[in-house]
């Protein structure tokens, strides 16, 4: 079973692809889709994200998508961009009938470390350990996406 986790963002959207085989969880791939506000209009940035997410979905055929929920933020401009990206991702998933689960950052932290108050470094170390990686996944957005996918797998069990 393949689960894709996504940490939505307009400038940099993290993704992580995990596979569960006979109870074992492994990282298939992870990375980021980046768009630049300097080079692209907002609509072009959203189209790039939609296209690249579609390619991920077609390549890995996920059984589930897990997505970070938007939480309160003081930067309304950033929140609007993230909301637009979330809409694009939800659309791409619905077009392919991929079930979507959404988690808050605290839910993800609780599922991965047992504490909703874990810091970024603790989360990254746990992801490295739980997925038996040789190093902490980078950039941070990709590590966050792996943790969102892993959270979903733990909650499904």
Region annotations inferred by a language model:
Residues 1-157:
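Phosphate- and other anionic-substrate recognition elements at nucleic-acid/protein interfaces
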